[in-house]
Swiss-Prot record:
Protein name as it appears in the record: Phosphate acetyltransferase
SUPFAM superfamilies given in the database record: Isocitrate/Isopropylmalate dehydrogenase-like
EC top class, as a word: transferase
Pathway assignment: Metabolic intermediate biosynthesis; acetyl-CoA biosynthesis; acetyl-CoA from acetate: step 2/2
GO MF terms held by the record: phosphate acetyltransferase activity
Gene, per the UniProt record: pta
Pfam family, one: PTA_PTB
Length: 328
């Protein structure tokens, strides 16, 4: 974990990327904000009721005098953001509805990012994934050519570093969706200094089993390879592989001789949300890997979701990752 963060901090040095932390009334978030403020790579913007936040800071003995603190209910920016929200939603929200929605810290924070007043957002310490992601999908939306956002986890232990996806967002995926996630995951790997070798996973290796589920992954491999070639993406994408064939050279030699990947994959695209979510938790709980994420990909600007059981360190680390995404 330290190696990844050190690489990102080097990239971010002197950049002072503005990251919105909507949950300023949470002590973990406020503590992390003071730690980030002390760096030259992230400048936090904290949202919340001034009286509550200042009282919390006093209780925790935190100096927040240099942190930008915004109360969505009383901010001078609100009128401007309300108008921008109404225009962005194109008839799906009245001004009155927008006024009410922007009292919500996640909507207000997301609008700060959309309006260019911040570079990214980290939330979820006190909100559900839906509460964090919904405003992003409505306001920031996905990049051109990307139809969905997806959630990857960095799985880290010692000097081992892998990406697992999608483990957080999409319950049902067709071949096109899997291909898109494979390409976006490869781009994420590149942006974090990895040489992407993407394995698309199944219970079959190179046709060893036959079913509609296997066919879906096989089609996804072809689509992902085609998309990567069109975009001149420096990545290897191959499949379908069982997990052992994707990560153990000796198994790959027997099960998939001649495959582009020979047990050296570092990015794993799971065939379903079920498989991805279960897979990362097994690696985390039984394998002893640190699971950093979910890191959302495919959005026009970075928005990331914390676990409600997160630590101060988690808030800090995900803010660093979000800032690095903003520089892409």
């Amino acid at each position: 974990m330290a190696d990844l963060l050190n690489v990102l901090k080097d990239k971010l040095s002197g950049k002072n990327v503005k990251i919105v932390l909507p949950e300023g009334e949470d002590e973990r978030v406020l503590t992390a904000a003071t730690q980030l403020q002390a760096t030259d790579y992230v400048t936090p913007i904290v949202l919340g009721d001034e009286t509550k936040v200042q009282s919390l800071a006093q209780k925790l003995d935190l100096d927040i005098s240099n942190i930008e603190l915004i109360n969505p209910a009383t901010s001078e920016l609100k009128a401007e953001l309300v108008q921008s929200f109404v225009e962005r939603r194109k008839g799906k929200a009245t001004e009155e509805q927008a006024q009410e929605l922007l009292n919500n810290v996640n909507y207000f924070g997301t609008m700060l990012v959309y309006a260019g007043k911040a570079d990214g957002l980290v939330s979820g310490a006190a909100h559900s994934t839906g509460d964090t992601v919904r405003p992003a999908l409505q306001i920031i939306k996905t990049k051109p050519g990307v139809s969905r956002t997806s959630g990857i986890f960095f799985m880290i232990k010692g000097d081992e570093q892998y990406i697992f996806g999608d483990c957080a967002i999409n319950p049902e995926l067709d071949s096109q969706g899997l291909a898109e996630i494979a390409v976006e995951s490869a781009k994420s790997a590149l942006s974090f200094g990895m040489d992407p070798k993407v394995a698309m996973l199944s219970f079959s290796t190179k046709g060893s089993a036959k079913s509609d589920d296997v066919t879906k992954v096989q089609e996804a491999v072809k689509l992902a390879q085609q998309k990567a070639e069109e975009e001149k993406l420096e990545a290897i994408i191959d499949g379908e592989f069982q997990f052992d064939a994707a990560i153990v050279p000796g198994v790959a030699e027997k099960k998939a001789p001649g495959a582009k990947l020979q047990g050296d994959a570092n990015v794993f695209v799971f065939p379903s949300l079920e498989a991805g979510n279960i897979g990362y938790k097994i690696a985390q709980r039984l394998g002893g890997y640190d699971a950093v994420g979910p890191v959302l990909q495919g959005l026009n600007s970075p928005v990331n979701d914390l676990s409600r059981g997160c630590s101060i360190e988690d808030v800090y680390n995900l803010s660093i990752i979000t800032a690095a995404q903003a520089l892409q």
